[in-house]
Every structure is written in C-alpha cells, then in structure tokens.
C-alpha cells in the first residue's frame, strides 16, 4: 500500500523540493479606463454596486475595501469603459485602497511599522478572529496551513491563544456581540502586535455594513496595520501580503 502511494505521488509530478518562493494568483478588480474621457458619469455602475464601492460624483473612483469583486459594474457600463485589471495585494492604510483615474492601482510595496517588523522578526504567530463572517475567509485561512500553501515554511503559524500571537488576523464585519471579545483578544496579546483586516467585510463591513455591526469594518474598533482586500482573498495572497508587509521580499 505504501509503495502504491509513493508511485502515485511520483506519477503526479509534484515538486520533491520545498518551494521557497510564492507567487499569488491575480485578483482582478474593476477599473474605468477614463484616460480618453469615455466615461460619461452616467452612474449606472454605481447604481448596480451592492456595496457602494463606486463613486462618480467627482472623479470615477473605486474603493477596493468595499468591492466584493462581483463585476456587475462591468456589464452595466453602456460605453464598456470598465475593465478587469490586477488588484494590489494589500495596503497599509485605508486610503490606500481608493483608486481613480488620477490614482490608478499599483503593486503594493509598503511595509508595516519598521520597529514592529524588526522585533517580530521572521517568526510570525497568528491568532485568527472571526467577528461574524460568512466563513469564506475562514476556509482560506484553513488552507494556508495545508501542504500546498504551507505557510510554516515562511515561519508563520496559527496559534490558539492571543497570548502567544504576534498578529491578529481579523475577518468579518465586527458584529456588535463580537466587539467586546475582539477588544479582549487584542488586549491579551503581547506588544508589539499587528492587526490585519482580511477581506472586504473586515475592511469596510461589506454587504453586512447596514446590519447589526459596530461601524464600517474593524477599523472603528481596532487600530489596523494592514488591509488585505478580497471576497475572500486567496491563501497565497494572504501569505504573500504578510511576507511583503513585514519586509520579507
């Protein structure tokens, strides 16, 4: 049986050596090509957006922190101005997820506070906290530890207690009943600590922003160091965002 399993493994041509580098699949985001002035600001794209991620009152603007990547805006545009382009991996500020014709998306290269990154070093313990998500982000977090993505090869691991954690990885829109638990979890972590908003709900509240939640995402409850957009962001994007934000390129 063991011999058969080994032959099956070899026949699949999987890499025998551990992978030291990780590349993320592109996450495509909607963006209006307004360079040639084709956008008439008819607001049809903004009207169909379920999370009000698009604003045409001034310059055509998309908020990647609100976007759920449904791409309904593309089909609604009568001039076919909106197209799919690769989305940035992360942002270190909320404003870093706002894009327009004068501020097009570019590859993420910012890092978290240097003092925090130097103290935490290359070993990152992560405490995942669900504040009321649909569990799509949790599925991706679970995959981060499997043999394929294997975040432990980069010195990352999920821990059960916030007292052992360096990073608080938060998902969900911060339901009111989770606010106190989130604050207690944050207070239990040793300093320095990093808070990461993973996914649209954690960043802005997403489709749940008008529900029984505390503010728009987790930023109204916790001080956020890193924003990772996506609905949900894939495992490799989360791992790669953490690596780059900690200055490990």
PLM ranges: what are they?
Residues 139-141, 149, 155-239:
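Cofactor-cradling patches in redox/metallo enzymes
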Residues 1, 12-15, 19, 74-162:
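Flanking helices and flexible, charged tails adjoining ferredoxin-like Fe-S electron-transfer domains
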Residues 34, 43-91:
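Iron-sulfur cluster-binding cysteine motifs and their immediate structural context
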Residues 52-61, 190-191, 195, 213-214, ...:
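Ferredoxin-type iron-sulfur electron-transfer modules in oxidoreductases and energy-metabolism complexes
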Residues 47-50, 121, 146, 187, ...:
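Generic secondary-structure signature for well-ordered alpha-helical cores
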Residues 6, 36-37, 64, 85-87, ...:
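Fold-independent oxyanion-binding glycine-rich loops
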Residues 1-3, 229-237, 242-249:
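Catalytic cores of enzyme domains
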Residues 1-50, 108:
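Ferredoxin-type iron-sulfur electron-transfer modules and their immediate structural context
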